Amino acid sequence: IGMQLMCLDSEEGDTRCLGIFPAHVVRLRGGENPLKIPHVGWDTVGRLRSPLFDGLGEDTYLYYVHSFAAQACDATIAQTDYGGIFSAALGRGNFFGTQFHPEKSGRAGERILRNFLKL
């Protein structure tokens, strides 16, 4: 929920947020083939564009639990596709947020947290 609060607004409760990231938070739709919502479990992350992801490759698996997600924007530093592309992580200046749970994402999550401490 922390990353979503730093976005412009959210469909969840039709809420204005802090506006640090230029992204709108929308309910996951599930795409052409209905997908299970909430999105719970392991999924890949790609388009890694930050030192936060040093040492990780494209299509690294991370753990998600969510029904809403930030749309991709110019602050997107990682993305995931679950019935459509959404921001898996956002970064701007010294602000970072992740949609996935690094604390539940095993070694990859540990690496991300260690990288964060080095920024």
Feature names for model-found ranges:
Residues 38-41, 46, 87-89, 107-112:
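A short, polar/proline- and glycine-enriched secondary-structure boundary/capping micro-motif
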Residues 25, 33, 83, 102-103:
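Residue-level signature for short turns and capping positions that connect secondary-structure elements
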Residues 1-39, 114:
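Cysteine-nucleophile active-site neighborhood
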Residues 44-102:
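Active-site oxyanion/phosphate-handling segment shared across diverse enzymes
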Residues 98-119:
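Acyltransferase
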